[in-house]
């Protein structure tokens, strides 16, 4: 996952540089259908009196922008900002449903933050859970949130490997010769005695 830093300048309102120890992750939607991650980052940077910010923005195409360091407070959920890493997600759907690329990037980002700060899945929340605000709008619905929450907090299944056996020989010398032919063809090969 690539994270682009576009840190908001330190200031009184949207990046006070107050320290915070991450204990939970809060998912938001931008509330601006079709807006890009770049546009929101620019808004945060140029509107210091807006009193709004977030640590991360996930774009429609899955790009990730960091606006506030993880260990600083961002202003995104009224009085629930201390200890919270906020993630704004961009969207194209008028109902607020996230794009697949956004969900994939959100999954990577959330798993990274969970591992880095030892945050349990139960502490990955919606803005709605913190303050009652209808955000992210499409995912205020409990079933939709449960499905999204499962996707963004689930670790990928361990990759299974399958072994292909080629040949069985009664002579070790013949087995070694054949293994060498397989290696010359560009494949890994070894001889096992059974």
Where are the regions a protein language model picked out?
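Basic/polar, cationic surfaces and motifs that engage anionic cell-wall
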Residues: 1-8, 14-19, 92-160, 170, ...
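Cell-envelope and extracellular/periplasmic
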Residues: 30-31, 80-94, 111
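N-terminal catalytic cores of peptidoglycan-degrading enzymes
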Residues: 1-78
């Amino acid at each position: 996952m690539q994270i682009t830093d576009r840190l908001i300048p330190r200031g009184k309102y949207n990046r006070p540089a107050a320290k915070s120890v991450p204990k939970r992750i809060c998912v938001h939607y931008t509330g601006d259908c079709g807006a890009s991650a770049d546009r929101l980052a620019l808004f945060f940077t140029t509107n210091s009196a807006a009193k709004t910010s977030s640590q991360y923005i996930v774009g429609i195409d899955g790009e990730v922008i960091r606006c506030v360091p993880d260990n600083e407070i961002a202003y995104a959920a009224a009085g629930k900002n201390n200890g919270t890493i906020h993630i704004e997600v961009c969207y194209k759907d008028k109902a607020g449903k996230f794009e697949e690329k956004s969900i994939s990037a959100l999954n990577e980002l959330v798993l990274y933050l969970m591992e880095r700060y030892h945050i349990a899945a139960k502490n990955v929340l919606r803005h709605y859970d913190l303050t009652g605000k209808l955000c992210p709008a499409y995912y205020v619905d409990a079933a939709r949130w449960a499905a999204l929450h499962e996707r963004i907090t689930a670790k990928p299944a361990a990759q299974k490997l399958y072994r292909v056996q080629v040949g069985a020989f009664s002579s070790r010398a013949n087995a070694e010769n054949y293994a060498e032919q397989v290696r010359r063809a560009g494949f890994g090969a070894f001889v096992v005695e059974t």
